């Protein structure tokens, strides 16, 4: 699948912060081309899907779980490190995450030869903690995600490290836009895209690229009821913070939306739908049964929406889903499924 035409520039330019163009996306693709995977798509044509999917015309799933570091997060993390100065690279980067962003920053830092510290909650899946260690990052274990963000801020202040935010900022949105551009370019027939929403880093970029390339396409976001910060933000007309988060999908468990990604979502996303945790559990099983993949809850969210609240919208349409990532241990995978309500 051909990338969008782009210049050979190896560094990101200075852009208007609230605008992303096709030229911006194609330039980012050039930067990422040598280090990332242009992930495959799988068409939902197998007879095994019969009786599961609504009456769609056709569909494809973009398999970002096969990306470097196991998720789409590698795109934005690598762009983020590439855009900092050489002086900043010498001081290193720091991130706070219990999810896929932790592994993505550790991977991107190793690739760029930059020191990385990752603040992670103690309850983080051991696979992710060990993965960060294996990539050469220093892991700081914290009480919870709030403590992890506090440690990240302290580390940045004390050591001069550059913060790599898990979803807010141009590099994260632009990285995800390269994913959206790949998908819509490979499958121009798709007219309805369903994309998981955590903090908004994935959908803000994918929706922007999709609408730039195929403006008539419909973009639907999906959030758990227990972590619906973007749904509530759009309802309020501004980025909001939730009082609490309660979902099995830790990768979608952001307690807040933030202004940068929220603004792109407001402009380019047609609707946000919500799903229950058990909807994701069922779709995790479906992915295992049909595609033989071990999908974490967030990875199964788009499928859960398609067979749930989006099923009527999808009738007669070509549908695109994204399997956004899957860094989950088998122990945690089975524990989540066994806890089904």
Residue ranges and their predicted role:
Residues 3-4, 10-341:
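PLP-dependent amino-acid enzyme catalytic core
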């Amino acid at each position: 699948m051909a990338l969008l035409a782009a210049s050979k520039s190896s560094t990101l330019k200075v852009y208007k912060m609230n605008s992303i163009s096709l030229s911006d996306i194609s330039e980012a693709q050039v930067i990422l081309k040598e280090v990332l995977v242009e992930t495959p798509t799988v068409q939902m044509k197998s007879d095994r899907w019969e009786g599961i999917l609504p009456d769609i015309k056709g569909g494809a799933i973009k398999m970002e779980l096969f990306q470097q570091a196991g998720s789409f997060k590698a795109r934005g993390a690598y762009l983020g490190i590439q855009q900092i100065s050489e002086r900043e690279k010498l001081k290193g980067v720091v991130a706070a995450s219990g999810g896929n962003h932790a592994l993505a920053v550790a991977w991107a830092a190793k690739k760029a030869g930059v020191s990385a510290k990752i603040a992670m909650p103690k309850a983080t899946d051991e696979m992710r903690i060990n993965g960060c260690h294996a990539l050469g990052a220093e892991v700081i274990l914290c009480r919870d995600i709030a403590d992890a963000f506090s440690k990240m801020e302290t580390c940045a202040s004390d050591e001069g490290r550059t913060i790599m935010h898990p979803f807010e900022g141009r590099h994260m949105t632009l990285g995800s836009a390269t994913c959206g551009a790949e998908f819509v370019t490979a499958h121009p027939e798709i007219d309805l895209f369903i994309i998981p929403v955590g903090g908004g880093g994935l959908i803000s970029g994918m929706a922007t690229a999709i609408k730039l390339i195929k403006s008539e396409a419909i973009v639907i976001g999906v959030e758990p009821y227990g972590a619906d910060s973007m749904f509530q933000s759009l309802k309020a007309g501004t980025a909001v913070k939730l009082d609490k988060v309660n979902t099995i999908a830790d990768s979608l468990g952001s307690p807040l939306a933030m202004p940068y990604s929220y603004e792109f979502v407001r402009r380019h996303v047609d609707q946000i739908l919500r799903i229950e945790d058990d909807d994701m559990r069922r779709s995790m099983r479906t992915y295992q049964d049909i595609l033989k993949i071990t999908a974490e809850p967030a990875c199964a969210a788009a499928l859960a929406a398609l067979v749930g609240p989006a099923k009527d919208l999808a009738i007669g349409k070509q549908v695109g889903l994204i399997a956004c990532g899957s860094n989950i241990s088998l122990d945690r995978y089975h524990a989540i499924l066994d806890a089904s309500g």
